[in-house]
Structures are given as C-alpha cells and as structure tokens.
Curated annotation (Swiss-Prot):
GO molecular function annotations of the record: glucan endo-1,3-beta-D-glucosidase activity
Protein name in UniProt: Glucan endo-1,3-beta-glucosidase
Domain of life: Eukaryota
Enzyme active site: E137, E142
EC assignment: 3.2.1.39
Signal peptide start-end: 1-18
Organism: Cryptopygus antarcticus (Antarctic springtail)
Enzyme class label: hydrolase
Temperature dependence: Optimum temperature is 50 degrees Celsius. Retains 20% of the maximal activity after incubation at 60 degrees Celsius for 30 minutes. Retains approximately 15% of the maximal activity at the temperature below 15 degrees Celsius.
Influence of pH: Optimum pH is 6.0. More than 80% of its maximal activity is maintained at pH 5.5-6.5.
Annotated control of activity: Ca(2+) does not affect the enzyme activity nor the thermostability. Other cations, such as Mg(2+), Mn(2+), Cu(2+), Zn(2+), Ag(+) or Hg(2+) do not cause any serious adverse effect on the activity. Also no significant change in the activity in response to the addition of 1 mM EDTA.
Length: 270
C-alpha cells in the first residue's frame, strides 16, 4: 500500500482547494435502466471482430438484481437482420449524460473465462475532431477473462492506422482475482492529467499538458477537452485477444459469465 502514497499526493494536488461533489450516480436499485442508459445494438463485430450480438434491454443480458447491474454473456444464436448471426449475446450500455472532467468510478466484480472482455470506458459525445480515434477514447478499465489478476486502462487518439496513438497503464498485474470480489475502478480526469485508480489508490498518471497529435489538435490535451459519455459492456472474443484461438464450445468452461456492477458514480470538483 505504501507504493501508492506518492501518487495519492499527486491526486490531491491536481485538485487542490475544493471538494468532490457527487452529481451523477446509478446504484441499480430498480427503475427502468433505459431511463439513464442507452442500449447499443447489433452483431457487426464492433470494429474488433467480436463474437456477440448486443441486445436491447433484455433481462437475459442486462438486469438489475439484488442492488446490482448484471451483464451476462450467453451462448445462443442471435441476429440483427443485417450482419451474420452470432453465437453469443450480451449487452452494451451508454449513459444518457456526458461530461468534461471529473472523477468516474465503478464498483464491480468481473467475469472469469476465456475470451470474456468486460469494459468500463468513455467515448466522445460529439466527434469534433473526426472519426475514431481522432476524437479520442478513454478506457478506464479493460480486462481479459482468462487473466483474472490483470487490468489495463488506455487513451486512444490520432488517426488510424499511421498516426494512431495509445498511452496508459499498460497491462497491470495485481495480487487480486477480480472475479472473486467487488473492487472500485476509477479515473480522475482534470484539465492537466488523467489518473487511474484501483480501490481508491492511484496506480497510473498520464499528463494532458502535451499535444497528442502535432499540427492537428489545436491545444494541449486535445482531444480530451470535450465531453465524453460512459460505456459498460461485456464482449466475447475479438482483436483484444491477439489472435488467440477460441471455439464457442469453450464457453462451457467459463467460471463466471457475468459482469456485476454495484454502482457507477461521477463527481465534480468544486
């Protein structure tokens, strides 16, 4: 724990002379999920050759249960009438609200099993710098289900393929099985920096006081100077697994096919 002391001081200094004020939360205690969240739908692979279809507010894939959001990856054939049918279903949810800067936190227990890919991340509300990744992407927490002690967070920017940039935590191992219990995963986003947190401890910082794409972004910190919304999803397979083979029948060996979220919260520094 002592290794986190200095980053915590940096976190305090980045937002000195004020206090965090909670201004958005979902504790998943009831009500219609669609009041606060959009459901993104389809079987198009989502730019990553993913193996699931995302469905629309369907209890088998996204439900509130015992004060939690439960997103489940289910092996079943599904289609959207446009793309080839897929052998898995799941859910991908985005907040109706969007923000520039603040503290973002999720308390969750992650799935466990080959090629399960939960994510807590953010995309720009308006792609003011152009299509992905020009307008940025903020990955707060991603995870591979066959590596239950490893998480990562990333900023994506620039232009694919030649000028695409990625900075962030890299693949970070912890003495924790993230599928065994609930943990908090967070991001402190100020005009000057992004700080990734695990259980309230800062474990990585990236400065925003730089030009991420010289000659295209017009000021330091761009494209992370616009409003972003939150995404929660659970994918199956795809490019994230680096070409590692996966047969759908291997899902029979999944130890835990659910991404359980106790809450998502957002604070502003005032």
């Amino acid at each position: 724990m002592n290794a986190f002391t200095f980053p915590l001081l940096l976190a305090f200094c980045a937002f000195a002379h004020g206090a965090w004020v909670l201004d958005w939360e979902d504790e998943f205690n009831g009500g219609n999920l669609a009041d606060r969240w959009n459901f993104e739908l389809g079987c198009n692979g989502w730019g990553n050759n993913e193996l699931q279809c995302y469905t629309d507010n369907r209890g088998a894939n996204a439900r509130q249960e015992d004060g939690k959001l439960v997103i489940s990856a289910v092996r079943e054939w599904w289609g959207d009438g446009v793309n080839p049918d897929k052998e898995f279903t799941s859910a991908r949810m985005t907040t109706k609200a969007n923000w520039l800067h603040g503290k973002f936190e999720m308390r969750a227990r992650l799935p466990k099993g080959k090629h399960l890919w939960p994510a807590f991340w953010m995309m720009p509300q308006n792609s003011e710098y152009g299509g992905w990744p020009r307008s940025g992407e903020i990955d707060i927490t991603e995870y591979r289900g066959q590596r239950p002690q490893q998480i990562l967070g990333t900023l994506h920017f620039g232009a694919a393929p030649d000028n695409k940039g990625d900075v962030g935590t890299g693949e970070r191992d912890f003495p924790i099985d993230f599928s065994a219990d609930f943990h908090t995963f967070g991001l402190d986003w100020s005009p000057d920096s992004m700080q990734w947190l695990l259980d309230d401890q800062v474990y990585h910082t990236e400065s925003l006081q730089r030009n991420f794409w010289d000659g295209v972004y017009n000021q330091n910190g761009s494209p992370f100077d616009k409003n972003f919304f939150i995404i929660l999803n659970l994918a199956v397979g795809g490019n994230f697994f680096g070409g590692e083979p996966f047969d759908p029948s291997e899902s029979d060996g999944w130890a835990k096919n659910t991404f359980e979220v106790e809450y998502v919260k957002k604070w502003t520094w005032n």
